Amino acid sequence: LPLIDAAADCGCEYYVIDAGWYAPGEWWDSVGEWQECRERFPGGIKEVTDYIRKKGMIPGVWLELEVMGINCEKAKKAPDDWFFVRHGKRVFDRSRYQLDFRNPAVIEHVNEVIDRVVNEYGVGYIKMDYNIEPGIGTEIAAESVGQGLLEHERAYLAWLDDVFRRYPDLVIENCSSGGLRMDYALLSRYSLQSTSDQEDYRNYAAIAANAGSGVTPEQAAVWSYPMRQGDKEEVIYNMVNAMLGRIHQSGHLAELSAQRMELV
């Protein structure tokens, strides 16, 4: 809660709860159901999102809806045609399966998640990540794996269109380990784009300065991570990086000195 207070004091408009809100510990290979973790939120995540709104900000959460971990209980029970399949076996990368958005049951699953986080959890912003490589496609209901991939991608875009029709005020950020999926098939739908997961402000400057060659500045989200300690130029450098696009304010704001907070 102190970090929420500090973000509000800085003038942030959105406050996003990052990865991990759905699990008490390690979660990489078990994601896929996206239910609030009561060990992390004994009073429910709505208690926190309500507090965020009370502080004048719109709450958000991190999701990676296009995948299910190989140890996700729902994935174990789902039929193979929920996922990309090649040579008769589910395709997995980095311990995750790729969902096939041509399947109506998959659409029903992801819509349930979106409806729940918006209507029950009170979320108005989604950081939609994507951290796998689906490969050349799927052989399910296709004459070639490439056809399966293309039809899946078109179905995914159609699903996004439907989400924004149902929730026109919802903001969804396009993210893929940062900026690895920066294209305007997606960005003609998505609200904004993560430009990088780079955490070193000295390395981020070149990324921020060149992001406009791939994405409009008003969609280019750039991180600022002011550190707890250091000279004031570090804070200024962080903030100037982010001011080239959409400021994604991060860092331990509640633990900054008064001088460093004033610079932010």
Placement of each model-derived feature along the sequence:
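Short secondary-structure transition/capping segments
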Residues: 26-28, 59-69, 105-117, 171-178, ...
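Active-site-proximal substrate-binding groove within the catalytic cores of carbohydrate-active enzymes
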Residues: 156-264
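Hydrophobic alpha-helical scaffolding
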Residues: 38, 100-104, 146-153, 225-232, ...
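Generic domain-boundary/flexible-linker signal
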Residues: 26, 70-72, 137-139, 183, ...
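Short acidic-hydrophobic sequence patches enriched in Asp/Glu that either
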Residues: 40, 44, 152-155, 263
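Aromatic-lined carbohydrate-binding/catalytic grooves of carbohydrate-active enzymes
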Residues: 1-112, 125, 142
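Active-site and adjacent substrate-binding regions of carbohydrate-active enzymes
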Residues: 2, 23, 37, 50-54, ...
